[in-house]
Amino acid sequence: MITTTSPTIEGKQIIEYKKIVFGEVITGINVLKDIGAGIRNFFGGRSGGYEEELIQAREAAIEEMENRAEALGANAIIAVDVDYEVLGADNGMLMVSVSGTAVVVE
């Protein structure tokens, strides 16, 4: 499955547009990671725990979107957009949503 943020794929011709496809993941943020991130934030470092959580959530959302495109008979997704949102009363949830246009290319 070709997945790109571009509206076209160089060297490929789009022969059919299927529909817009989405992938969403909502994950809780671990309390221990919060404590570690707070300490690193205080001292000016990066939070590896949060970064790993973000990477995993993004990859899962993209995989979900690709599975939905494949179910439509698409072999590529163009114009992919990735959005992040912090949710919950205490900002304890992370939502990653991705969208793109499922297409068939030669």
Swiss-Prot record:
Coiled coil: none annotated. SUPFAM superfamilies: YbjQ-like. Signal peptide: none annotated. It holds the Pfam family YbjQ_1. Belongs to the UPF0145 family. This is UPF0145 protein. It comes from Listeria grayi.
